Amino acid sequence: MQLTDLIVPTAVATPGMRVADVFRECIAKQVPGIPFRDAKGHIAGKASIRHVLKLNCIPDFMVTHGSILGDQIDELTIPAEKARHVINLAIDDFIIPDPAVIGPHSPVAKALAVMERHNTTYLFVIDGDNYLGTISIMGVGAAALSLGES
C-alpha cells in the first residue's frame, strides 16, 4: 500500500471563500476538511466542516453535557435561516492553524501515526509548497480491506 495511491486531490480554501464552497468541495470529495492557502500562497491551516458546525450550530453547554442531554431538545435544532447565514460566511474566521501534514514519500504507517498524534482522521499531503491532496482514515481502511481481500 503506497501513500500516493491514497491521495484524494481537492481544491484549497482561500481568503474570502464562502463556507458553502468549502462544504461543497468537502462533500464532493468525501473529506472532512480542506487546506487553507493564505494570501501569500502558503498552506496556513485547515477548513473543517466539523469546526464550522461546532462554532456556529451547537452551544458550548451541549458539547460539555452532550452525554446527558435527552433526545427531546427540538428547540435546539439548526433552523434554515441559521444554515443560510452560516454557509454564506467567509471561511477565514474558522481556519484551524497547523494542520496535520505529511510528505508524499512517507509510509502509510507514518500517516496513521501523524493522524493519531494530531487527533484527526485526515491529513494533507504536501511536497514543499505543493499541495497534492488529502488522505483520510477511510481511504486507508478501504485500501487495507481491498488488500486483505485480494
Where are these predicted regions, by residue range?
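Bateman/CBS regulatory modules and CBS-like beta-alpha motifs in cytosolic regions of diverse proteins
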Residues: 1-31, 36-44, 67-114, 125-126, ...
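Short beta->alpha transition motifs characteristic of CBS
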Residues: 31, 43-60, 119-124, 131-148
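Charged, low-complexity, helix/coiled-coil-prone segments
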Residues: 13, 50-61, 81, 87
